[in-house]
Amino acid sequence: MKWVKHGKESAGAEETARWMAAAVTAFAMTVMAVTLPGCGGPPTGVTPPEPPLKPPADTSMAPVGGAYHVHPGEDIQQALEAAATTGPKRVIVHAGTYAPRQPAQAMVWFNKHHDGITLEAEGEVILTAANPALADQSKRGYPAIVNHVVYFGDGISGKTTLRGFTITGANGFVTQDEKPVDIQPPIEAPKLEKGKFFYTDGGGIKIFGRSYPVIESVTVTDNFVSPCGAGISVEHRGYSDGSRLQSVQLRHCIFRNNRCPVSGSAVDLLHGSGAEIVNCLFIGNLSNEPMDDMAVTPGKWRPTHGSSALTLFPGSHVLVRRCTFTGNRNAIDDASSGNIYEQSIFWQNTAPGGWPPGGRYELDVASGIGVTGCFIRGEINDLRKSIDSERNVIGCDDPRFDAHFVPQAPGFESAGYRPVSGPAAVK
């Protein structure tokens, strides 16, 4: 199979065109997890315990109290199929750790058939890409056995919600095998053929095509992929106009300790993608990790200062409101214009290491006109000097974060992330 190049061809400068062209022409091999040597290294956090595995329950799963219920050792995907086929469109996953049942492209997947379902956690629920009992220790990505923990495919609207989970364990495993399951049936639309980034990016969550889910109160932590988008990869391929209807909604989420060699270690918005990110915390996410064979193409995006926790490629749209970025290896790089960053804190995103020769930055935005009410301080506050210092506090005082990263210093009352409990309150 040959990797396919996709992007918004009219967007971006010559640097972008050269970078994307290299991603296609230099990557002529087929990626199969069973044949590629090497690995990006084990996840940096605590490896979740090996969960008990049971044979799938019989297919006569029945709802109780207006929802399908899944307990440890049972099959989340089976409940999603039942909800999609007969309803009700609510699946509750009870406390425990859930791992993949077989090597595949994803552990849990949604496509058009599943639109309108709410999948939510009750108690502490960990979804992990790792299953040491089934993984081959000699292969790339061990102990992960799926490309993506959760996949949202073409045909998903804002009526579909993922809520309350911890998503972890991705480690650079890649397979193109569409058996035992094909997570994305053929799409009758231009520009939506599967390319390299469909398989490699989005270790925690991959969002592809005309897909605009709501992701709420989810912690995405300790994922590694190569080359890009360890936490969440959004690949709308131009099917986003920046409106709420055509944007992924990320609310009250935490992105922590996700790593990749190139761009968007926490969230990566590929060409022509869209997201609204409200009340989220980004901490300890590391782009620009050591380059490996998978990252040779596309190569080093932003070769002097590197990429960041949140990356936007040309033609992508974002609204970032009341978020906190701290301790990342750079905060935001945005190659588009007209994007909005409001009431957010960018504090000391100066994590050491990585391949870029240049200094660390807080914001590298092509247009700073949409940056308002933000508090910014790091090694380089405003890489392009595009941000209005009268509408933001550049070189701000220490926000004095508490253990939950809530600022305690005066003046920060309306800025940055705040923990929430229960259903989302901030819209």
Q: Language-model features: where?
A:
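N-terminal secretory signal peptides that target proteins for export/translocation
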Residues: 1-19
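C-terminal motif of bacterial Sec signal peptides marking the signal peptidase cleavage site
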Residues: 37-38
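Acidic, glycine- and Ser/Thr-rich low-complexity intrinsically disordered tracts
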Residues: 45-66, 132-136, 140, 144, ...
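Acidic Gly/Asp/Thr-rich repetitive segments characteristic of extracellular carbohydrate-active
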Residues: 60-94, 99-100, 109, 416-425
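Extracellular beta-strand-rich solenoid/capping regions of secreted or surface-exposed proteins
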Residues: 77, 81-86, 99-118, 126-163, ...
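Extracellular beta-strand solenoids
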Residues: 93, 100, 110, 121, ...
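Structural detector of coil-to-beta-strand junctions
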Residues: 107, 147-149, 173-174, 195, ...
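Right-handed parallel beta-helix
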Residues: 121-124, 159-171, 193, 211-226, ...
